[in-house]
Structures are given as structure tokens and as C-alpha cells.
């Protein structure tokens, strides 16, 4: 996901395999705990390459490959912390805030042919060994539970079904963002 040419090739393989691509979901992400003082250049570069550079160049390749008579959708998986960052994952939060800005810029640049939106999940899948932490998270959010991958799928299906939603960030947090 670091090589813009390889990303172009991914879209091209999709076009060749399926006769075209009209949906792009950017969901790959690196999530590495590193505060301001712990963030190295390598952590910074890795986070930005996967979380922001790849979605940009995939969207560019997608837009170039989409025939002018077809409509398309791009959905970027952001994070609710893009809108309310903390201190523990500085580079990650910055990349997800950048992904929200990219979502809105792409909606302006590619509309009306392509609708571009983001989903900003809250607590969905615990990190390895994070089950106890997720229990604490669930206790403090209004839904009193963490989400499931199926809820992200439902949000994506809503965005794909809509023909009037673009440039939006759909929070799927159970109220964790409040």
C-alpha cells in the first residue's frame, strides 16, 4: 500500500476481473500507540503511507478508471477520534483527520459522479489482549456495549444505497464520541 503505481495496479486488476469497479472502500489501517514523544519518523511514515497516502492514490486510480457514464462510491474508514483526538496515538489520529478532509475534498472534486463518504467507528474490535479494556469502554458509552463489524457493514450499505449523501462522516460509535 506504499507504492502509488502498485495501487493503480490494484484498481486496474479489479477493472479487468469484473469489467469495471464502481465501489472503493478504503479500510486498511495501521493503529500504533505512540504519543508525541514516542512517535518516530518510521512510525509517522508508516501511518501516513497506509492510512492516508494509500486512500488518496486508490481514489485517484478509481476516479480515472470509472467510465463517465457510471456512478461510483468511495467509502473511507476513518475513526471518531479524527474529530476528537487524544494524545496516545498522535500519528494515527492525524492520519484519520486527514482522511476526513480527503473525504470532503474528494466529494467536491468527484461529485456528482462519485459519492464520497467516511464511516468513523468507535470501539468495534478489541486489539489483541484488549477485552478487559473494551469492557470498561462499554460501561462508559451510552449504548453500554461496543459495536460489531456488522454495524459497520450496515453503515456502508446505507451510504451505498443513498444517492444524496456525500462528503459526510457517519459516526458509528454507540455514543462514545459524546
Per-region residue spans from a language model:
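Conserved NAD(P)H cofactor-binding loop of Rossmann-fold oxidoreductase domains
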Residues: 27-32, 174-175
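Alpha-helical segment proximal to the catalytic Tyr-Lys
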Residues: 64, 108-112
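Active-site helix of classical SDR
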Residues: 59, 95, 103
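C-terminal substrate-recognition "lid" of short-chain dehydrogenase/reductases
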Residues: 148-172, 177
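Active-site loop-to-helix junction immediately N-terminal to the catalytic Tyr of the SDR YXXXK motif
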Residues: 39, 85-93, 105
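Substrate-binding pocket helix/loop in short-chain dehydrogenase/reductase
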Residues: 35-36, 43-48, 129, 137
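Short, small/polar-rich loop/turn modules that mediate ligand/substrate recognition or access, typified
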Residues: 111-115, 166-168
Amino acid at each position: 500500500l506504499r507504492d502509488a503505481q502498485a495501487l493503480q495496479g490494484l484498481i486496474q486488476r479489479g477493472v479487468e476481473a469484473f469489467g469495471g469497479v464502481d465501489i472503493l472502500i478504503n479500510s486498511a489501517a495501521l493503529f500504533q500507540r505512540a504519543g508525541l514523544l514516542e512517535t518516530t519518523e518510521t512510525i509517522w511514515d508508516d501511518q501516513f503511507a497506509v492510512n492516508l497516502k494509500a486512500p488518496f492514490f486508490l481514489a485517484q486510480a478509481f476516479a480515472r478508471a470509472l467510465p463517465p457514464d457510471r456512478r461510483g462510491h468511495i467509502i473511507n474508514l476513518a475513526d471518531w477520534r479524527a474529530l476528537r483526538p487524544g494524545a496516545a496515538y498522535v500519528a494515527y489520529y492525524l492520519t484519520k483527520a486527514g482522511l476526513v478532509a480527503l473525504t470532503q475534498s474528494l466529494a467536491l472534486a468527484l461529485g456528482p459522479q462519485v459519492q464520497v463518504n467516511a464511516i468513523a467507528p468507535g470501539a468495534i474490535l478489541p486489539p489483541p489482549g484488549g477485552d478487559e479494556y473494551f469492557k470498561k469502554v462499554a460501561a462508559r458509552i451510552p449504548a453500554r456495549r461496543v459495536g460489531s463489524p456488522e454495524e459497520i457493514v450496515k453503515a456502508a450499505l446505507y451510504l451505498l444505497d443513498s444517492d444524496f449523501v456525500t462528503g459526510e462522516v457517519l459516526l458509528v460509535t454507540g455514543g462514545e464520541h459524546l
